[in-house]
Structures are given as structure tokens and as C-alpha cells.
Curated annotation (Swiss-Prot):
Record's protein name: Small ribosomal subunit protein uS11
Function: Located on the platform of the 30S subunit, it bridges several disparate RNA helices of the 16S rRNA. Forms part of the Shine-Dalgarno cleft in the 70S ribosome.
PROSITE patterns according to UniProt: RIBOSOMAL_S11 (PS00054)
Disulfide bond positions: none
Organism: Bartonella tribocorum (strain CIP 105476 / IBS 506)
Length: 129
């Protein structure tokens, strides 16, 4: 039995003027997702998706490259202004934010939504170098 050819779905151009950027910056990687106001993903990128491997994924430069790529994808959909939600303790937080500003987005607000435990789970052991 012949398998049906999978149809390639073309991305339709959505005219969305404002959105929300979720910057998730961990110690190992930086993930950036741009959504509309309802939370539907418009564009995403990460340092690993841009070809950085291993320890280079966690650098500020990798976060900057990922943010610029994600911003270009969102600008194709007509996005101009952004709210920023930053989550996590990683090195790419500020550099991703600066990259979004340099591309030409108007940033209306910046929120830090890093979850802070009120004495929850026991943390990882401290590194001794």
C-alpha cells in the first residue's frame, strides 16, 4: 500500500503588531519564543538550534544570535512591539534582550518570571572548583 505524500504546510503571514517574548535562559542553553497575546507561538529559536554545541550554547553571544534569528522570523509576521518575560539564571538574559532592541522592536515592558522557591526542593550540591 503506497503511503500518501505528506503535504508541506506553508506558513501563512499573520499580521500581529504586538506580542510577548519568552526568554528562557538556563545554565546550558537559551530558548527564545515569541507569542501573540493569547500565547500562540509565532516564532522560536534557541542557541542549540543555531548550531552552537556543548558549552558554547550557554554563552551570551549564542543567545544574541538566537534572539536575532527569532526576531527576524517575527518581523515577517508584521510584529513591531514586544513585552519581554525573562526566566532563568543563565548568561544569555541581557544579551538576548539587547539583540531584540537592536533589531528594531519597541519593548513595552520587561518582567522577570523566574520561579523562586519558598523553601521547596533541596538544591543541587555546590560546585567546588
Amino acid at each position: 500500500m503506497a503511503k500518501e505524500a505528506t503535504r508541506v504546510r506553508r506558513r501563512e503571514r499573520k499580521n500581529i503588531s504586538s506580542g510577548v517574548v519568552h526568554i528562557n535562559s538556563t545554565f546550558n542553553n537559551t530558548m527564545i519564543t515569541i507569542t501573540d497575546a493569547q500565547g500562540n507561538a509565532i516564532a522560536w529559536s534557541s542557541a542549540g538550534a543555531q548550531g552552537f554545541k556543548g558549552a558554547r550554547k550557554s554563552t551570551p553571544f549564542a543567545a544574541q544570535v538566537a534572539a536575532e534569528d527569532c526576531a527576524r522570523k517575527a518581523q515577517e509576521h508584521g510584529m513591531r512591539s514586544l513585552e519581554v518575560e525573562v526566566c532563568g539564571p543563565g548568561a544569555g538574559r541581557e544579551s538576548a534582550l539587547r539583540a531584540l532592541q537592536s533589531v528594531g522592536f519597541v519593548i513595552t515592558s520587561i518582567r522577570d518570571v523566574t520561579p523562586i522557591p519558598h523553601n521547596g526542593c533541596r538544591p543541587r550540591k555546590r560546585r567546588r572548583v
